[in-house]
Amino acid sequence: MSSKETIPMHQRSQNVAELLTVLMDINKINGGDSTTAEKMKVHAKSFEAALFEKSSSKEEYQKTMKSKIDAMRSTRDKRKRESVGSASMMANLGQDGTNNNNNNNNNNNNNLNMAASFMGGDMFGRNQSPAQNSNANTNLNTNVGPGVNGPNGNDGTANPQMFMNQQAQARQQAAARQLKNRQMGGSSAQQQQLTQQQQQLLNQMRVAPIPKELLQRIPNLPPGVTTWEQVTALAQQNRLSAQDMSIAKDIYKIHQQYLIKAKLQQQQQRQQQQRQQGNPDVNNNMAGSNNNNNNNLPMAQQQMQQRQQQQQQSQQQQNRNPNQRHNVLSQINQMFTADEQRALLQEAMEACKNFQKTHFGGQMSDANKQAFIKKFINSKALKKLEAMRMAQGGNNNANLNKGQADMLQRQQANMQMNQQQQRAAQNQRRGPVMNDAVSQGYNNQMNSAADSTMNNSNQPMNIGNNGVNMIPNQSQQQQQTNRPKEQTPQQPQQRIQSNRSVPMLNPTPEDVEVVRRISAEAAKTQLRLTDLTNSLTPQERDEIKKRLQKNQQLFAQVSSYAPQVYLFTKSESFLKEVLQLRIFIKEILEKCSKGIYVVKLDTVDKLVIKYQKYWESMKIQLLRRQQLLQQQQQQQQQGMDPNRAQNSQQQQQQNQANMQQARNRKPTKNQTTPAIAASVAMNMNDKGASMSPALQKAGSAVPNFAQQMSPNMTPGTIPPTNVLSPHSQSHIPMVSPTMAKAASAAALKNDTASSSRRGSTKPRGKSTAPVTGKKTSNAPTPQVVPATVPSTTNLSAAGTPNIRNKSATPLTAGLSPKSTIRSNSNTALASAKTPSPMTVSIPQPGNSSVFKKEEEYLSKLQLRKEEIRFRQKQRLDILSSSPVDLFLTTVADCLGINDEEIELINKIPETTADNINNTGKKKLTKAAQKLRDKEILNVSIQVGEKDKLIMSSKAPDKVMDYSISAMSLAAVFKNLSSTGSLNNIALSGSNATTSKDIGNIYSHTGGVKRKFDEVEISPNSNGSPSASIMSESKKIKIDSPEDMFVTHSSEAAKGTNNSSLMDSGKEGSCKSMAGSATEVNDTSIWDWNFWTSIE
């Protein structure tokens, strides 16, 4: 046996050419167009390639190819003979109809072409006389076209397009003869009254919309013409040529045949249902009795009725044996197009791969694979066939005037089903695509496996359609069979359906297996993360930390509820993607907690947006599930308790409104709507919609960091997004540069960095209200009292722990009054929230307008402070190459000069100007543009002869005054020397002052670590020292810049007011009170009037 590789390429090309020649002949007989011919070329090449791959030897390849070509040739010859015979039969029948039209004494009226000519003559030619119909008991059942299921119905390869072309050609010839005979004897023909059924059909034809497929074949029709009545009006107006009229008449007859056949089938189905209800035994003798009644019918009509009887008998056998599986692979080529077949084959192969992984551990024989694919495709074909049957059965009692837009589609499906039944009996030929993928062997052991796989992959829950669309094929057959017998009340049926759909909400073993498998696959994901720490600026690192920390619970929610969403969506791709992202997020969080950054800021933004979209869609699915449960409960309560059913309906309407709100809302932030979250959580807890233990066990195959972050969160409830467990924040250290820590049980965290990024934060009015009572906790919270009493201040600088001095300390220079007020306000608010037995709750006024003026003033001060910081940062970045411009613009800010009036001395580099104005070749990325949009000022550079740096405010008033008092500005330049030249200006005695300050501030321990002295907590505390207040971890290095804000107790006791700590200038305000004649009393900082008196 020679190898198939020895076959030369020219021989293979010759085989393709021979096969293509036969296919082209068949296409020409069928009346196909050039598009079909191009598809034939592709099919021929695909068939030869598949056959070559499938063949094991050269002899097998040649033998199979020869047999296939011979079979195709025989089919072509047979098609030619049938086409000629059909044309001649139609011509003869048309001639008989013409003779009957000319003879008024002929009582035989069983030919359908005569009825068609009646309708066509009355429709298109009012002056033409139809033939006399003296047979009063003629039934419409005899008016069946001989070509509807004529000789072409016996061919296993015919299609509806070829059938329509043949019938149109035959009827056109018959109509031409009839038209000629009528023109010859039209004056002598007598008008005949139509029967009631024919008149009804004629009226229906006048108003019925012409199907789109037929309407396109009529040339020169103006737009808007959709009925035959409109076409007739055009003909009477002579707007259609004779050729157009001839084509329109042929199309009219085809449309008429469709309506007649549809009505005939409906009538036969009603008769069949009546016989089944009356006496089931009559069905066994139905073929014989019907044959006795058809002795006087033409041969074509008898053949058609015999085929319909066979179809009915086969359907009855299927109804008696609903569990029996039929092999309809022989009809694949007629049920699916070539593209659909390829897609179906690809889907079957994917399902086979998944089944192989889950049941055979990667090992599966070729025979089993082929049997599985064959079973999969056969089940698909059965489902499509059953769907067509249900569509046909559901339209039995429908009005013919309704649903006429899709009438042609249903009729084509019915015609296709009739031909498919005949081809199933012959089983002569299979599709060119499916025969090569499926072998002849059939393994019955794979049936249940293939069915379960298809049900899992191709039957998702359709929760939005008041039920779960997971009915198997056998159940559909039983419903179709028992449809006429379903005369019982609807209420028990609804209860049965609800009882059937309830178990479907619980996870099946297949669901658990899929979740476990996907979790295992996600755990094996290889992550290659690059350390980007050195390439990121400190600001970017802080921003990444804050965003990851802020969205931790969003990540946890999506990961926790993904298995539940999979239960009623069956979307494996969604579950796999979420689990893979969970591994990715977990790795990022672990690296970030160690100070290693593996992603950039724009990547974090993309992840957050993706998770927000996930959560929005998951909330909609959860609401749908809740709605389904309520519908089932409502169906069960109907007839028992009307009040409970009404309440259930109201709750269902509320859930629908919430779901619509969730759809319309854009996912901007990871915040769950309180109404939606509470509603879903309450209902899912009440109705037991939580995840089953089996699914929880399957989902725990991979470590779920979401459960660690929220240990109290159950799978059945939607957690609120504004609550984070203490353990969840342990993954990433707090990002805030300002942190107030206490040794008590309640830890107070104040993130000033996030508040500065958001803009203004309004302190609550109760921060200034008097507090009565006393706290015994160690929280560093001074109590606000209106009187002037000796107290110590707890002013914490940026990033330092709380610093306490035993003696009274004056107001630290460099700290603005608004900073002290905000610190005290936040501290008082935190003390009110701290659980303690000694805490006295502060009554909050019902009307918040009492401190509205103060709140607006503080908000304006906070906004001004943030803008000053931002302006100074922008000047440092843009004017770093020009110290003169940096100095002068800062002084101009302090003097309140507008930016547009300031002209820079040196030119700004072109690259810097293009980057700021975003006018260069390299545009900003989306992430960078988002960051720029979040900035509190609009920055731009006016390029000209003298450049200008413009920073406009986004505040509502658009104008902000950044000037400071003249006294404060003069204090900065108080100790200047050599003011004659700008290059020689210096601060006199600055070095000595710095040395003295350092000597006063730091202890003389030689640069070793030291511990702060323990002091009292608040002004009213007893001040008992405790060793637990400051641990060893709170020691500060001597070279720390934060020690600049600490005054040693021994030096503070002297009450020296000469040393002053000037502000670093980052705010640009330079608000230093050093050197002023007014000495600040330390007790006056608690007096509100003191701060309002400061300008």
UniProtKB/Swiss-Prot annotation:
Ranges of Low complexity composition bias in the record: 99-113, 133-154, 166-178, 487-500, 633-662, 780-793
Location of the protein in the cell: Nucleus
Primary location group: nucleus
GO cellular component terms listed in the entry, alphabetical order: mediator complex
InterPro entries with a match to the protein in the record: Gal11_coact (IPR033789), KIX_dom_sf (IPR036529), MED15_KIX (IPR036546), Mediator_Med15_fun (IPR008626)
Pfam families assigned: Gal11_ABD1, KIX_2, Med15_fungi
GO molecular function terms listed in the Swiss-Prot or TrEMBL record: transcription coregulator activity
CDD domains per the UniProt record, alphabetical: gal11_coact
Function recorded in the entry: Component of the Mediator complex, a coactivator involved in regulated gene transcription of nearly all RNA polymerase II-dependent genes. Mediator functions as a bridge to convey information from gene-specific regulatory proteins to the basal RNA polymerase II transcription machinery. Mediator is recruited to promoters by direct interactions with regulatory proteins and serves as a scaffold for the assembly of a functional preinitiation complex with RNA polymerase II and the general transcription factors.
Name of the protein in its database record: Mediator of RNA polymerase II transcription subunit 15
Source species: Candida glabrata (strain ATCC 2001 / BCRC 20586 / JCM 3761 / NBRC 0622 / NRRL Y-65 / CBS 138)
Gene name of the record: GAL11
